[in-house]
Amino acid sequence: MNDQVASYASSGVDYGSLDPVKVAAQRAALATAPSLGQHGAQEITASRGESAYVWEESDAYRSLVIEGLGTKNLIADMMRPVTGKTHYDTIAQDTVAMIVNDLVVVGALPMVVNAYFAVGDGAWMNDRERANDLVRGWAAACEAIGAT
C-alpha cells in the first residue's frame, strides 16, 4: 500500500467553497417553501439545513435525506489491492446507516431509501464487481431496516 493521505481536502472537498453555496441554496429554497401549501403541506422550518428535512401533510409528517457515499470510496479503492475486495458492499451499508441516523434525529424512520450514486463518470460502473457490490450492499441494508 502506498502512503497516500486520504482527507476531505485531498479528495477535492473544500468546505470553504461549499458552505456558502449550501447557505445560498437553503435561502433560495426557503423562498419556495410556500409552494408546499399547494399540496396541502407545510414545512417544519426548524428542519431546514438540518440532517433531515421535515414537512407536515394532513395525515402525517414526512422526512427526506439525500446522502452520497462521501469519501469512504477513497479508502476502499486504496484497500482493494491489499485485500482483494472492493468493500463497496459495506460502504453501501454504512451510507444507508447514515441515512437512518439522519432520519432518527428528527423522529422519522425510513420507508424509502433513494440510491444516490454520484460516481462522476459512467465508466465507474464498468467495474462490474465494484458496481454489483455497491448495489448488493445497498439492497442488504434496505432489507435490514425494513425499507425499499
Language-model-detected regions and their locations in the chain:
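Glycine-rich phosphate/pyrophosphate-binding loop regions near the starts of catalytic domains
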Residues: 34-148
